[in-house]
Amino acid sequence: MEPIQVHKGKAVVLDRVNIDTDQIIPKQFLKRVERTGFGQYLFYDWRFQADGADNPAFELNQPEANGASILITGHNFGCGSSREHAPWALYDYGFRVIIAPSFADIFYNNCVKNGLLPIRLSPEETELWMERAKESQEEITVDLGEQLIKQNGLETKFEMDSYWKQMLYNGWDEISLTLQYEEAIAKYEHRQSAVNK
Protein backbone atom coordinates (compact mmCIF):
# COMPACT_ATOMS: atom_id res chain seq x y z
CA MET A 1 0.00 0.00 0.00
CA GLU A 2 1.07 3.54 -0.65
CA PRO A 3 1.70 5.48 2.58
CA ILE A 4 -0.45 8.51 3.38
CA GLN A 5 1.50 11.01 5.43
CA VAL A 6 0.64 14.39 3.94
CA HIS A 7 -1.88 14.48 1.12
CA LYS A 8 -2.63 17.58 -0.95
CA GLY A 9 -5.54 17.48 -3.32
CA LYS A 10 -8.64 19.06 -4.74
CA ALA A 11 -11.92 18.25 -3.01
CA VAL A 12 -15.33 17.43 -4.45
CA VAL A 13 -18.56 17.54 -2.45
CA LEU A 14 -21.20 14.82 -2.61
CA ASP A 15 -23.74 16.32 -0.22
CA ARG A 16 -25.90 13.26 0.37
CA VAL A 17 -26.50 11.06 3.40
CA ASN A 18 -26.71 7.27 3.73
CA ILE A 19 -24.76 6.55 0.55
CA ASP A 20 -24.60 2.77 0.57
CA THR A 21 -22.09 0.43 -1.01
CA ASP A 22 -24.50 -0.48 -3.81
CA GLN A 23 -24.61 3.19 -4.80
CA ILE A 24 -20.83 3.41 -4.54
CA ILE A 25 -20.44 0.40 -6.86
CA PRO A 26 -23.48 -1.54 -8.11
CA LYS A 27 -23.51 -5.31 -7.64
CA GLN A 28 -23.35 -6.15 -11.37
CA PHE A 29 -19.72 -4.96 -11.44
CA LEU A 30 -18.47 -7.20 -8.61
CA LYS A 31 -17.46 -10.19 -10.71
CA ARG A 32 -13.70 -9.76 -10.37
CA VAL A 33 -11.32 -10.06 -7.43
CA GLU A 34 -8.54 -7.77 -8.68
CA ARG A 35 -8.46 -4.44 -6.87
CA THR A 36 -8.06 -2.36 -10.02
CA GLY A 37 -10.43 -1.42 -12.79
CA PHE A 38 -13.39 -0.53 -10.57
CA GLY A 39 -13.04 3.26 -10.75
CA GLN A 40 -14.94 3.36 -14.02
CA TYR A 41 -18.00 1.97 -12.20
CA LEU A 42 -17.88 4.30 -9.19
CA PHE A 43 -21.34 5.81 -8.52
CA TYR A 44 -22.33 4.27 -11.85
CA ASP A 45 -26.09 4.73 -11.53
CA TRP A 46 -25.60 8.41 -10.67
CA ARG A 47 -22.73 9.22 -13.05
CA PHE A 48 -24.37 7.78 -16.14
CA GLN A 49 -27.77 8.00 -17.76
CA ALA A 50 -29.69 4.93 -18.98
CA ASP A 51 -28.14 5.28 -22.47
CA GLY A 52 -24.60 5.31 -20.99
CA ALA A 53 -24.02 9.04 -21.49
CA ASP A 54 -22.63 11.12 -18.62
CA ASN A 55 -25.25 12.53 -16.28
CA PRO A 56 -24.53 16.28 -16.55
CA ALA A 57 -26.19 16.96 -13.18
CA PHE A 58 -24.01 14.59 -11.14
CA GLU A 59 -21.37 16.22 -8.94
CA LEU A 60 -18.41 14.12 -10.11
CA ASN A 61 -19.20 14.95 -13.76
CA GLN A 62 -18.72 18.69 -13.21
CA PRO A 63 -15.50 20.16 -14.70
CA GLU A 64 -14.36 21.41 -11.29
CA ALA A 65 -14.48 17.84 -9.92
CA ASN A 66 -11.95 16.59 -12.45
CA GLY A 67 -8.87 15.24 -10.68
CA ALA A 68 -10.33 15.52 -7.18
CA SER A 69 -8.68 13.20 -4.65
CA ILE A 70 -10.66 14.25 -1.56
CA LEU A 71 -14.36 13.40 -1.24
CA ILE A 72 -16.46 15.34 1.28
CA THR A 73 -19.83 13.73 1.92
CA GLY A 74 -22.69 13.21 4.37
CA HIS A 75 -23.60 10.98 7.32
CA ASN A 76 -23.33 7.19 7.27
CA PHE A 77 -21.17 6.92 4.17
CA GLY A 78 -20.59 3.32 3.05
CA CYS A 79 -23.62 1.81 4.77
CA GLY A 80 -25.32 -1.31 3.44
CA SER A 81 -23.69 -4.58 2.55
CA SER A 82 -20.03 -5.21 3.27
CA ARG A 83 -18.24 -5.13 -0.05
CA GLU A 84 -14.56 -4.42 -0.27
CA HIS A 85 -15.09 -3.43 -3.90
CA ALA A 86 -16.48 -0.08 -2.67
CA PRO A 87 -13.15 1.25 -1.33
CA TRP A 88 -11.40 -0.36 -4.32
CA ALA A 89 -13.62 1.68 -6.66
CA LEU A 90 -13.05 4.92 -4.73
CA TYR A 91 -9.28 4.36 -4.68
CA ASP A 92 -9.13 3.34 -8.34
CA TYR A 93 -11.10 6.46 -9.31
CA GLY A 94 -8.42 8.57 -7.61
CA PHE A 95 -9.74 9.35 -4.15
CA ARG A 96 -7.29 9.11 -1.25
CA VAL A 97 -9.23 10.90 1.51
CA ILE A 98 -12.93 10.80 2.44
CA ILE A 99 -14.35 13.29 4.92
CA ALA A 100 -17.77 12.68 6.50
CA PRO A 101 -19.56 13.03 9.85
CA SER A 102 -19.88 9.24 10.08
CA PHE A 103 -19.09 6.02 8.24
CA ALA A 104 -20.45 2.50 8.39
CA ASP A 105 -18.00 0.59 10.62
CA ILE A 106 -17.09 -2.19 8.19
CA PHE A 107 -16.70 0.27 5.34
CA TYR A 108 -14.43 2.47 7.49
CA ASN A 109 -12.19 -0.51 8.28
CA ASN A 110 -12.13 -1.59 4.63
CA CYS A 111 -11.05 1.92 3.62
CA VAL A 112 -8.03 1.85 5.90
CA LYS A 113 -7.12 -1.69 4.83
CA ASN A 114 -7.12 -0.51 1.21
CA GLY A 115 -5.18 2.73 1.51
CA LEU A 116 -8.02 5.27 1.84
CA LEU A 117 -8.00 7.76 4.72
CA PRO A 118 -11.53 8.10 6.17
CA ILE A 119 -11.84 11.19 8.37
CA ARG A 120 -14.73 11.72 10.78
CA LEU A 121 -15.58 15.34 11.53
CA SER A 122 -18.51 16.86 13.35
CA PRO A 123 -21.50 17.74 11.14
CA GLU A 124 -20.64 21.44 11.55
CA GLU A 125 -16.99 20.93 10.57
CA THR A 126 -18.00 18.78 7.61
CA GLU A 127 -20.42 21.48 6.44
CA LEU A 128 -17.69 24.10 6.78
CA TRP A 129 -15.33 22.07 4.57
CA MET A 130 -18.13 21.39 2.09
CA GLU A 131 -18.70 25.13 1.73
CA ARG A 132 -14.97 25.77 1.41
CA ALA A 133 -14.64 23.13 -1.32
CA LYS A 134 -17.61 24.56 -3.23
CA GLU A 135 -16.18 28.08 -3.07
CA SER A 136 -12.56 27.34 -3.93
CA GLN A 137 -10.64 24.96 -6.15
CA GLU A 138 -7.54 25.49 -4.02
CA GLU A 139 -5.97 22.26 -2.81
CA ILE A 140 -6.67 21.03 0.70
CA THR A 141 -3.80 19.61 2.77
CA VAL A 142 -4.46 16.60 4.98
CA ASP A 143 -1.60 15.93 7.39
CA LEU A 144 -2.07 12.48 8.93
CA GLY A 145 0.91 12.84 11.28
CA GLU A 146 -0.53 16.03 12.78
CA GLN A 147 -4.12 14.83 12.25
CA LEU A 148 -4.92 18.16 10.65
CA ILE A 149 -6.91 19.36 7.61
CA LYS A 150 -5.91 22.80 6.35
CA GLN A 151 -6.44 25.24 3.54
CA ASN A 152 -5.61 28.92 3.37
CA GLY A 153 -5.86 29.70 7.09
CA LEU A 154 -8.63 27.24 7.96
CA GLU A 155 -7.49 24.30 10.10
CA THR A 156 -9.45 21.43 11.59
CA LYS A 157 -8.06 18.74 13.87
CA PHE A 158 -9.36 15.19 13.46
CA GLU A 159 -9.14 12.06 15.60
CA MET A 160 -7.99 8.65 14.43
CA ASP A 161 -7.25 5.36 16.16
CA SER A 162 -3.47 5.01 16.54
CA TYR A 163 -3.45 1.51 15.01
CA TRP A 164 -5.24 2.65 11.82
CA LYS A 165 -3.10 5.78 11.69
CA GLN A 166 0.08 3.69 11.84
CA MET A 167 -1.20 1.40 9.07
CA LEU A 168 -1.95 4.28 6.69
CA TYR A 169 1.07 6.40 7.63
CA ASN A 170 3.46 3.52 6.90
CA GLY A 171 1.53 2.06 3.96
CA TRP A 172 1.04 -1.26 5.73
CA ASP A 173 -1.70 -3.75 5.09
CA GLU A 174 -2.29 -6.58 7.55
CA ILE A 175 0.25 -8.83 5.81
CA SER A 176 3.03 -6.25 5.77
CA LEU A 177 2.28 -5.44 9.41
CA THR A 178 2.60 -9.14 10.30
CA LEU A 179 5.90 -9.29 8.41
CA GLN A 180 7.28 -6.62 10.76
CA TYR A 181 7.24 -9.40 13.38
CA GLU A 182 8.52 -12.18 11.13
CA GLU A 183 11.64 -12.82 13.20
CA ALA A 184 9.69 -12.99 16.48
CA ILE A 185 7.11 -15.30 14.87
CA ALA A 186 9.85 -17.61 13.59
CA LYS A 187 11.44 -17.76 17.07
CA TYR A 188 8.08 -18.55 18.65
CA GLU A 189 7.37 -21.30 16.12
CA HIS A 190 10.83 -22.76 16.73
CA ARG A 191 10.26 -22.78 20.51
CA GLN A 192 6.82 -24.35 20.08
CA SER A 193 8.11 -27.09 17.80
CA ALA A 194 10.82 -27.89 20.38
CA VAL A 195 8.22 -28.10 23.17
CA ASN A 196 5.91 -30.33 21.13
CA LYS A 197 8.55 -32.94 20.26
UniProtKB/Swiss-Prot annotation:
It catalyses: (2R,3S)-3-isopropylmalate = (2S)-2-isopropylmalate. GO terms for molecular function: 3-isopropylmalate dehydratase activity. It comes from the Bacteria. GO terms for biological process: L-leucine biosynthetic process. SUPFAM superfamilies: LeuD/IlvD-like. Pfam families: Aconitase_C. NCBIfam families: leuD, PRK01641.1. Catalyzes the isomerization between 2-isopropylmalate and 3-isopropylmalate, via the formation of 2-isopropylmaleate. This is 3-isopropylmalate dehydratase small subunit. It comes from Shouchella clausii (strain KSM-K16). The lineage of its organism: Bacteria, Bacillati, Bacillota, Bacilli, Bacillales.
